[in-house]
Amino acid sequence: MAQAGRSGDAFASLDQRRERQEEQAQSGLDKVFYFQGVVELFNRMKIAYGRTPAWTALMKCNAIYLKDFKTAVGVEGTRYGLFFAEEVTKPTWSPDIGANLITLGEKACLDAQNAKYERLQASLKTTSGLVHQVMEKTREAKENLEKANKIQEQLDKVIESNKALHRKIQERNREKMQEYMVRLHNTQKDRDDWVQRCSRLEQENVTLQKRLKEKENALVSVGWDLLGWIVISVLVFGLISLADAQNLTPPAKIVITPGQAEFMDLAKLEKIQVRKYRLDSCELPPEKGCVLYKDYLTTRPVSFLELMAKCSKPDWVSESSYNETTLMEECIQIFGAEWCEGKLVDLVPRKCGEQHVLVNIIEQIEKTREVVTLIYGKVMSYRLDMWITSIFSLVLAGNKEKLFKMAPFIFVAWFLNIPVFLTCVAVNIFPVVSLPFILFQIFMPQFVLVNAFLLWLTLTLTAFYWSEGPKILMEISYALVYTIGFVLWSLGLAVGVTLKLTMVHQILMFCVVAAAICGTKFACTTITVQHPDGTTAKYTRVGKLKNNVVNQCKKVVTTLQTRGVIPATPAKTASIVIVEGKNGTGVGFRFMNYILTAEHVVQGSDIATLKNGSVSVKSKVIKTIPIFESVDNVAVLKLPPELNSVKPIKLAKKVQSDYLTLTAYDPNFQHAATFTGWCIIDGNWLNNSFDTKFGNSGAPYCDHDGRLVGIHLGTQGVLSQGIVIVDALKNTFQLADQCRPQNFDMDEFLEKVIAGTKVSHAAILKELEELREEVQFLKKKCVTYDDYWLCQTIFGQAKGKTKKTVRGRKHLVTKRALGKGHFMKMRMLTDEEYQNMIEKGFSAEEIREAVNALREQAWLNYCIDNDVDDEGEEDWYDDMVETDRVNQEIDEAIERAMEDRGEFYQKKSRLTFVEQAMMHLIQVSKERSQTAKLEVQKENEAQLVKMFERCVTDENTPEGTTSIAALSTEDDVRLVEGKVIDFTKAKNIPVDGEIRREIIPGTKCTEISTGPENKKNILKKKDTHIAEGKVETKSSQQPVDVKDDKPVALEQRKPRACKWCGSSQKHDYRECRFQREKRFCVYCAAMHSMFEGHIRPIECTSCKKSFSGIEKLEDHVVSGECQKN
């Protein structure tokens, strides 16, 4: 039994050894590629079985092994299927019996390929979510960039408007300066005219004085002559006169008016014995004299000498300071009665009878005071003081505690004759602790500051020791308030004692002040309004009134300023066309999808000619729109497709008299012309002073926003006539109102939308959190720096998007459009099209030119559709080459890192010998196949060249044997064919400073020499003996039997699969994403894709009619087809 047990243990160890060998045999199989004969076998089988169901089922497998022309094995999951074709036309597929027909080595290769495919799928699923996040971030970056561009455009517009305003201000300033210069010139001219006129008048005055002097001399001579004749007459006839013939009759009185006396001197007035009078005038005399006026204040009386000094020049004298009797007595005492007679009238010749404005005001105040006194007397006749005192007494008696507290103070106030009411107010307001201080203040009012300080100290200490917790701070603050109030009360008490205010006056003043304070506080309070969206707004009653007043003032100022400044108006030359009818030519403009013009332009014509630039088309007159109070109408023409480039004009929102712009053509209809000015709107009529010509009829009037106001009809005299058509167009082109479904609850609908948004948002956040956890888990698995970099390359970023590369730096900036290099690498022909061109005899150069022409056309179409500027795309080829080079370096780095880890990495394509920088030896005969591949570091290139020369001999290969030897270094590339290769001399070269050496056995023997900084030299050798029905591979492992002499199939690259639909067929991935990506649907209030369709049935809620799309449902509702609506 012991021996049996030992033998059993021995067999168990053999089984374990066999399992370890199988595992070692499978390690690295996913990197193995089999070249010989597989492509030809695959093409033959595809041509023979390509359209059969069995071949289709075989192609769906994850890994495929082609044994011969009739037999193949496919692996999908854990199932091994068998493809067998006993006849070419009848192949069969068995999904579960393939494992019985393959060897252990073949099964290991299939398992490795299947595992590689599953790992690739897992990697794609892991990265799909991260790629989606990157795309979303890119979209948000695009939106932010567009917003920034819009803000920049708005800033540019503001800058342009500021520049235009600055130019207008400068122009206005120049105009004002020119106007002021003209006025200054006119003023100087008038001044010179006046100077000349004054000089002429002075000359005339001198001439007149000379003439007057001459006349005076003549009069003096005549007077002397007359005096001589009088003396002679007295001597001759003197004796004849009688002594008693004296004439005692008094002279007759001569009445002289004050106006006449003003122009007569004193001597003449005394000669004719006329009494002087003062003139009733408030104007100062021209040379000297005072004006007597009434004053409202009493002033000091003036003396006669002061009056003479004051009235030596024009001045004013008040009636209160002027006492004519006293002044006359002073004058007689000084100068005598004869000299003083009439002197006061000479000094004060004028008297002002008007009253001063302040006198009128004082009289009004006196009248008001009399009325108030009268009313107060009437009120006091009803004995209201008794009623007020009684009410105050009842109020005090209503609270017995306060009454007992106030009683001593009321008695003291009555005894000391101080205001009782103010004392009661103090006792009621201040705390009990302050009552002794109030009593002390009543007796000793002069110690108010000391008393207030002691009160503050007492209240503060009381608050600190008698209160607890947060109440201490509140009580201390109250102590300060009570102290300030105590000082104010003391001052009020002193004022009341001084003015001797009665109790009634005290009560009335207290009630009025309290009501005013409370009312003002209520008017200034702030009202907080909370809106349904959660925002709050604060308003004040006074602020609201103030804002209303300010807004009204702004409106008035804006109205006053509107007429003075001509605003900038958008040009509407791109919206007008020339309209030619039978009876004349005019102007038309586009409104919506119609051309409008005046009716008299196309009168008598059913079809008119429309011209815009070089385009001339015919259009039919659809209808006319009548205008109220106008003999002319508006003609409506159909918009031809050729004039779709004409821009439409929108209706004005507000119609009022303003600066408007008329857009028309010159008389020759060659260029557009605009007229801008003030237009007066009177009802429907529009009047202006534009210099319009014949042919401007039908032109549009637009406001400063470029919106349509009216249409031009013609010229009446010097005024242009237009008509306002805003209301007429609104009534004619009414929009159809959309009906709301019956029993539709908007609030419930909004609640569903909000709830759905919250649910979808929560799901997105949950999925995002799960993805973050997975990424963090992958990061933790990275042990070394190479592992971390590798994970970052595969899972963290898209390939080539690292910041250390050129493509990574390009990735930092959001790419707004594709480059030309993308299109110049695009595949334009399918395999069938390419094959057809070859069959038709096209050469390779002709096919290449045709493909390049298609690529150029695709690039131009892309630029036109996406508004991309192709300027600067001349260097697209250099950029494409540089990008490919950088991507190739990244691929090589990833491959090396993954080979070091012993993990799978799917290559994009096979690398050439030059790109690999290595030595590759291949020799194949009918009996044997040998390969050797050696990759070394740069410092071992010289040793690699010597080894290549030793391995490649000068002997030619025998018939039936093929050999290829390739060497690729930085400075040398060699390719030798048809020479015998000595594989025994192909050995691995140790790397400088070798740390360790590894040998990985298997079907291909791999030797790795590792040095510092993870530098490696790798040698891979394989020797396969081909016999009939058996393939022997020399390595450190046992030979593996193969039942077929066909070479192993090459590892095929998996086609790209769409992450939205899973199909590997070429199609529009963007459209596929648009159809299958889930979005929030407002109609269904849920998340779904367009491919899934709407969750909520699309039907009319009124008539229950179903529709295939929401657009048809909207048409059904808007067009009024629903009979129940």
From Swiss-Prot:
GO terms for cellular component: host cell membrane; membrane. One of its GO terms (molecular function) is serine-type peptidase activity. The keyword Cell membrane does not apply. Residues 131-218 form a coiled coil. Gene3D superfamilies: Trypsin-like serine proteases (2.40.10.10). Keywords: Coiled coil, Covalent protein-RNA linkage, Host membrane, Hydrolase, Membrane, Phosphoprotein, Protease, Serine protease, Transmembrane, Transmembrane helix, Viral RNA replication. The record marks 170-171, 552-553, 797-798, 916-917 as: Cleavage. Its EC number is 3.4.21.-. Cleaved by the viral and host proteases. The protease is probably autocatalytically cleaved. The active site is at 600 (charge relay system), 632 (charge relay system), 697 (charge relay system). It comes from the Viruses. The chain crosses the membrane at residues 220-240, 379-398, 407-427, 437-457, 479-499, 507-527. The modification O-(5'-phospho-RNA)-tyrosine is found at residue 834. GO terms for biological process: proteolysis; viral translational frameshifting. It catalyses: RNA(n) + a ribonucleoside 5'-triphosphate = RNA(n+1) + diphosphate. Belongs to the astroviridae polyprotein 1A family. This is Non-structural polyprotein 1A. The lineage of its organism: Viruses, Riboviria, Orthornavirae, Pisuviricota, Stelpaviricetes. The gene is ORF1.
